[in-house]
Structures are given as structure tokens and as C-alpha cells.
Regions:
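A conserved beta-strand/loop element that lines the FAD pocket in flavoprotein oxidoreductases
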Residues: 251-265
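N-terminal glycine-rich phosphate/pyrophosphate-binding loop and immediately adjacent elements
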Residues: 3-146
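A glycine-rich dinucleotide-binding beta-alpha-beta segment and adjacent secondary-structure elements
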Residues: 192, 196-212, 357, 375-388, ...
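Mid-domain catalytic core of redox enzymes
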Residues: 231, 237, 264-396
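Active-site/ligand-binding neighborhood in enzyme catalytic cores
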Residues: 129-255, 462-477
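Helix-rich C-terminal "cap"/substrate-channel and partner-interaction subdomain
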Residues: 123-156, 381-479
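Extreme N-terminal leader/targeting segments of oxidoreductases
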Residues: 1-7, 25-26, 229, 477-491, ...
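A conserved FAD-binding loop/helix module that cradles the flavin
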Residues: 501-522
């Protein structure tokens, strides 16, 4: 006989665990099912090289929402943020730019390249932060459906519009961010390519876009919306990114949450238009009237459900939902940290740059995208080297270090050859760039883990290895994420919900889709009990 729960969560990533923890706190008997042998999804810490613990996929803490941290009491369960330094951007010719929370410090760095750009930076920061403040409010909203004409939907849309009535002319600032390229947006403020590249760099992180791609300006804002104090809101987590998901899981377990690993879901069961449970690949069944899927919308709707039972327009929308990925991750165990020629501790004001961007100009970033656009890996990739072991002594042996390299572009599909035969070429391209700024770094490598988009897809199930479960473009955001009419975390199957990064507000280790989905689940449950 199938074991019964009040709610089942498919996928033990941070959003699934967050949703499950909130439901457990509300008194629901809740089960989380994870395909892998370890909980965490893209927020995991694993010992791939003996003695070295890698944050295998996600690598920096920024977007985890303060409400999730507080409600789930994560600090009680081992969650501790360690500071990242100001962002250090080495440039050719042994120069550099510093991008810091301290506006005056950033201005001083900019002023060595352009007095005009330095002078206008505080105005730009205030202008961008106005939009960020609006987006931070939108994070916790359930997107209404403005196209629906029933009274309930009309009231929800009217309530939403009234709530944000004071946005006024700032609406046009948001439209600019949603539609303009990063280069065009930044060129309205800055003149030097090196300075524009400091911010435009974010527009390519995790997305198949370059700084000249329409809509790429929004991705800058997505990455700076975090409310954690630090360089642009960035920090490390003691014990690696897996410490976040372990803390969420433990918080849930204290309230009765059940988490099971090595449980691959094969199908979501339904009867009479209502969710009734799940079936695993080994035939095991679990029953529940509430099922929340933390996996990609493509898997939820196109693999776990019978498409014939879904509205044809939803199937078409999900089939065309863009998930093509060009992100790679290389985790390195090494004898020593990269020693950047352009870094001077006295001049920079900190001991070592734990957070670095290699992508010196707009043109460099666009060339990296151009290679991928035509089906090849970037010959000169942009790279984010982060060095958590400089501040975290729990992840590497004494005197040794962990360096995480995230970057782009490495297309899921290559025009010539495949990743099985060309992965070493990617490594060479990446290390050539690192060694160009930090000579001799590659000589001290002890071991590494190389993840291309197909590797990421195989390990955590995100289609095409997309780290956000789908592109962050205007047609795939808010009331269109993952599809029009189904952005409120619900689905055409009553009792089946979406709680992962395919839902609003998208990817990043933030916990917001899980939080929002749990709120809607509990709201529906309360409504049903009154009927």
C-alpha cells in the first residue's frame, strides 16, 4: 500500500526544501523526494578531490531572501555567511578596477580611467537602486493574470496595480531594463568600455546573451538584487553552498519534514483532474493531495505529466520555453591561490581578492558571446574566479586551496565535435586566461572537476544545464514565467504546484519560488477547508 502524506515535494534543491519546510511548519505531513544521493540541488558541497570540498554548482551567496533566513531560523542550523572582498577586475597591462559597496571607493577606482564616469557613478547607483527596490518588492508577489476576465482574477490584478500605483514614472526605468541591451543601458551613463564591462559582466552570467543582446540589462539587476551585505551583496557560506540547503532541511526536519534521497520521480499521478501522488522509477508510489514540483517546468509538464491532459497552448509554451545554456563550472583543488599581477593589497585595501571578474571590456564580453552564438565555445571566455578557502578553513587541507571558476560561453550543442572530445579544449582556454593575469596558477593544480552544460543537466536535471531553469528575458518573467496564465505557482492539475526556479522570480539561490509557492498552497488549502 502506498504511503500517504499531506504534501509531496519533487526535488530536494533549495526551493523544494524551502517549500517543504514552510509546509511542515504549518503542520502538513510533508515528503521531499530527491533523485540524487545528496540533498541540495544546485546548492551542494561535495568532496570531489580527496580533502577538498567544492561548492559544485552555485558558488556565492547573495540572493537568499532575508525572510527565508529568519522564518526558518537558518543561523540556528549552521548557516553562516563569510565576507567576500570587493570585486576585483584585472585588466590587460597589469591594471585593475575595484567595484565595491563603498561608492567613494568605486569612484576612486573609476577615476583612474574616466573622471566623467567616476563623477556620475553615484547618480547611476541611485537610479539603478530605485528599480532594484521595486523588484525586491515584486519578488514576494504572486503574479496576477491580467488577461483573465473572471471576477477573482480582475480583483487580484486591480489590487496589484493599486499596490504599485506610486511606481509612476519609474515604470519606464523598469521597461528600459527589461528591453535594452546592457551596453546601450550603460552607455547612457558611462563612456569607458572597461567601466561598462564591470557591470555588463553580470548580463552574461548564466544566460545565452552578450552585453549587446536586447533585454540583457535586466540580468544585471537580477544579480544585484541580493540584500546580503558585502561586495555587491555577495558572500561565501561556511562549509560551502551545501550548508544552506542542509540548514533548510534541518529546519524542516525539526517540524516533521521527511527527506528521502535516491528517489527518482517518474510520473505525477492525477485522478479526475486532481493530483493524487507520484510514482518513482522503481515503481514505488507515494500518495498526497498536494504535489509541488521543484524541477524544471519542462520536466514537470512534458515528462512527469501526460501532455494530452494539459491545455495545448500550455504545452506549446513550455516546449518553446528557452533553456539553452552556455555556462560552465570548473572546480579546482590547488597548491596556491591565483597571484594576480595587477593586485596590490596596499592599493586595493584588502589582503586578497576572493571575488574576481575576468572580462575586461564590452568588446571582450561580446566576442565571447559571438563564439557561442555560432555554436563554438568562447576562445576567450569570461570567468569568475572565487576563492572561498581564503576565508573558510573547513573546505581544504591546511595550506591548500579551492578555486571555483564560473564562466561562459560553452554552448550545450557544439557546431563541431562534442563535449566528450572537446572538454580539454575548454579547460585550456580558461586556464590560458587565468594564467595571463595570474602567471603560474595552472602549475599548482592538484585536481579539478569540469562541468559543461550537458554535465550540469545530467547531474541536477536542469534542461540544457540552465542554471536559472530558463532565460531571464521579458517574455519569460513575472506573469509569463514559465508560461502565460500559469505564473501563480498553480497548474491545470488541481493540487499540483510549481515551486522551483522555472517560476517567478527565477533562478539563483534565493528560496523565493519555494516560499511563494508554499504561501499559495496554504492559501488554497485554507480555502478548500472553508468550502
Amino acid at each position: 500500500m502506498a504511503e500517504r502524506f499531506d504534501a509531496i515535494i519533487i526535488g530536494g534543491g533549495h526551493n523544494g526544501l524551502t517549500c517543504g519546510a514552510y509546509l511542515a511548519r504549518a503542520g502538513l505531513k510533508t515528503l521531499v523526494l530527491e533523485r540524487r544521493e545528496v540533498l541540495g540541488g544546485a546548492a551542494v558541497t561535495e568532496e570531489v578531490v580527496p580533502g577538498f570540498k567544492f561548492s559544485v554548482f552555485s558558488y556565492l551567496m547573495s540572493l537568499l531572501h532575508p525572510r527565508v533566513i529568519a522564518d526558518l531560523e537558518l543561523t540556528k542550523y549552521g548557516y553562516k555567511v563569510l565576507p567576500a572582498t570587493d570585486m576585483f577586475a584585472p585588466l590587460p597591462g597589469d591594471d585593475h578596477i575595484i567595484f565595491a559597496d563603498d561608492i567613494a571607493k568605486t569612484q576612486a577606482s573609476f577615476s583612474r580611467f574616466s573622471a566623467k564616469d567616476a563623477a556620475i557613478y553615484p547618480q547611476f547607483d541611485a537610479y539603478l537602486m530605485d528599480s532594484v527596490k521595486i523588484m525586491r518588492r515584486l519578488l514576494l508577489e504572486t503574479p496576477p493574470d491580467p488577461s483573465c476576465r473572471d471576477w477573482k482574477s480582475f480583483k487580484e490584478t486591480a489590487k496589484f496595480l493599486w499596490k504599485y500605483r506610486r511606481v509612476n514614472n519609474k515604470l519606464f526605468r523598469l521597461i528600459d531594463l527589461m528591453t535594452m541591451s546592457a551596453d546601450d543601458y550603460l552607455s547612457e551613463w558611462f563612456e569607458r568600455s572597461e567601466i561598462k564591462a564591470v557591470l555588463a559582466y553580470y548580463s552574461g552570467i548564466g544566460t545565452f546573451a552578450g552585453p549587446k543582446s536586447p533585454g540583457s540589462a535586466y540580468v544585471i539587476m537580477h544579480h544585484v538584487m541580493g540584500e546580503h551585505a558585502g561586495a555587491g551583496g555577495w558572500g561565501f557560506v561556511r562549509g560551502g553552498m551545501g550548508a544552506i540547503t542542509q540548514a533548510i532541511a534541518q529546519s524542516g526536519r525539526e517540524k516533521g519534514l521527511v527527506c528521502k534521497t535516491d528517489c527518482e520521480v517518474a510520473a505525477i499521478e492525477s485522478s479526475g483532474g486532481r493530483a493524487s501522488g507520484v510514482t518513482l522509477s522503481d515503481g514505488t508510489r507515494y500518495e498526497a493531495d498536494i504535489v509541488a514540483s521543484n524541477v524544471s517546468a519542462k520536466l514537470t509538464f512534458l515528462k512527469f505529466l501526460d501532455k494530452a491532459k494539459l491545455p495545448p497552448e500550455l504545452v506549446r509554451d513550455i516546449e518553446s520555453y528557452r533553456t539553452f545554456s552556455t555556462a560552465f563550472k570548473i572546480n579546482i583543488a590547488c597548491e596556491r591561490l591565483p597571484q594576480y599581477r595587477a593586485f596590490d593589497a596596499a592599493k586595493c585595501g584588502f589582503a586578497y581578492p576572493t571575488y574576481t571578474h575576468i572580462g575586461p571590456t564590452i568588446e571582450y564580453l561580446e566576442r565571447a558571446y559571438d563564439d557561442a552564438k555560432y555554436g563554438d565555445m568562447s576562445r576567450e571566455p569570461f570567468i569568475t574566479p572565487v576563492t572561498p578557502s581564503f576565508v573558510d578553513d573547513t573546505i581544504s587541507p591546511p595550506g591548500k586551496h579551492v578555486v571555483n571558476l564560473f564562466g561562459g560561453h560553452a554552448p550545450y550543442h557544439l557546431r563541431e565535435g562534442d563535449w566528450a572530445t572537446r572538454k580539454d579544449e575548454l579547460v585550456r582556454n580558461v586556464l590560458k586566461q587565468i594564467d595571463g593575469y595570474a602567471p603560474g596558477f595552472s602549475d599548482g593544480i592538484i585536481g579539478m572537476q569540469v562541468l559543461t552544460p550537458p554535465d550540469i543537466e545530467a547531474k541536477i536535471g536542469s534542461p540544457h544545464g540552465h542554471i536559472f531553469h530558463g532565460e531571464l528575458q521579458i517574455d519569460q518573467l513575472f506573469w509569463a514565467r514559465p508560461a502565460p496564465h500559469w505564473a501563480d505557482y498553480r497548474t491545470p492539475i488541481s493540487g499540483l504546484y510549481q515551486c522551483g526556479s522555472s517560476a517567478h522570480p527565477g533562478g539563483g539561490v534565493g528560496g523565493v519560488p519555494g516560499y511563494n509557492a508554499a504561501r499559495e498552497i496554504l492559501k488554497d488549502r485554507k480555502r478548500r477547508r472553508k468550502m
